[in-house]
């Protein structure tokens, strides 16, 4: 196993522990707590894949961080922080919408790279909006936290989420997954639109009808229906 993979996991475990302590002292806001829950699932998946114990990895990560901090001067830390572009966290969904449990009468699921697409194929003839919570860096989608499809009544009928065992994805991964989800929902005569915020930062554009400019590849996925894909 690559030692850098192990040390990265160890440091991530320790930093999650520090953030958990911050949350326990009620010092974290809603986006902070949201990322904390998502990262916990990701760490569990990575630990299972790597065959590493999270508690043991957390202790090892603490030693790595302490060693680095001893070697790091305040001036070097300031320079490092100044050179790293700052990311922003954008929310279409409330914390309640993100954490709400939902059920599918006709569940369908597809793994598309590092993302999992789920939808209820029993939903027909509805107006649906796709909302997402994600981080942005340099005015471009950086990391998708969660995307969900809502009817006008507020019912959740679809979802795109990162796979805990496969951390890391690109904005192209997200756009491809959105194309597949739209195709599946439209197969049952639903009308689907994407939130203006997600359009702006994933596609760098915004259409009044809520439809992003999908690539020919994504359009083929839509035309081919989702029955064989999700």
UniProtKB/Swiss-Prot annotation:
Chief subcellular location: host cell
- Xref: Pfam families: Flu_NS1
Q: Where is the protein situated, by its record's location annotation?
A: Host nucleus; Host cytoplasm
Task: Print the keywords alphabetically.
Answer: Eukaryotic host gene expression shutoff by virus, Host cytoplasm, Host gene expression shutoff by virus, Host mRNA suppression by virus, Host nucleus, Host-virus interaction, Inhibition of host innate immune response by virus, Inhibition of host interferon signaling pathway by virus, Inhibition of host PKR by virus, Inhibition of host pre-mRNA processing by virus, Inhibition of host RIG-I by virus, Inhibition of host RLR pathway by virus, Interferon antiviral system evasion, RNA-binding, Ubl conjugation, Viral immunoevasion
How changing residue 41 to A affects the protein? Complete loss of suppression of RNA silencing in Drosophila cells
The answer to whether the entry has keyword Ubl conjugation is yes
The molecule here is called Non-structural protein 1
């Amino acid at each position: 196993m690559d030692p850098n993979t192990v040390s990265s996991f160890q440091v991530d475990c320790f930093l999650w522990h520090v953030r958990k302590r911050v949350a326990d002292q009620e010092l974290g806001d809603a986006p902070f707590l949201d990322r904390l829950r998502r990262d916990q699932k990701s760490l569990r998946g990575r630990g299972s894949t790597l065959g590493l114990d999270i508690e043991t990895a957390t202790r090892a990560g603490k030693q790595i961080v302490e060693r680095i901090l001893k070697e790091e001067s305040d001036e070097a830390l300031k320079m490092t922080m100044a050179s790293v572009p700052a990311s922003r966290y954008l929310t279409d969904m409330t914390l309640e919408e993100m954490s709400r449990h939902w059920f599918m009468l006709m569940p369908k699921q597809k793994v598309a790279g590092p993302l999992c697409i789920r939808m209820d194929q029993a939903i027909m003839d509805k107006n649906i909006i796709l909302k997402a919570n994600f981080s942005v860096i340099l005015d471009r989608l950086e990391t998708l936290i969660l995307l969900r499809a809502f009817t006008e009544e507020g019912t959740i009928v679809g979802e795109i989420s990162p796979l805990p065992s496969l951390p890391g994805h690109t904005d192209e991964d997200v756009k491809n997954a959105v194309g597949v989800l739209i195709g599946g929902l439209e197969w049952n005569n639903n009308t689907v639109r994407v939130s203006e915020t997600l359009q702006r930062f994933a596609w760098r554009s915004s259409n009044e009808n809520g439809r992003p400019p999908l690539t020919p590849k994504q359009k083929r996925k839509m035309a081919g229906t989702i029955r064989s894909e999700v």
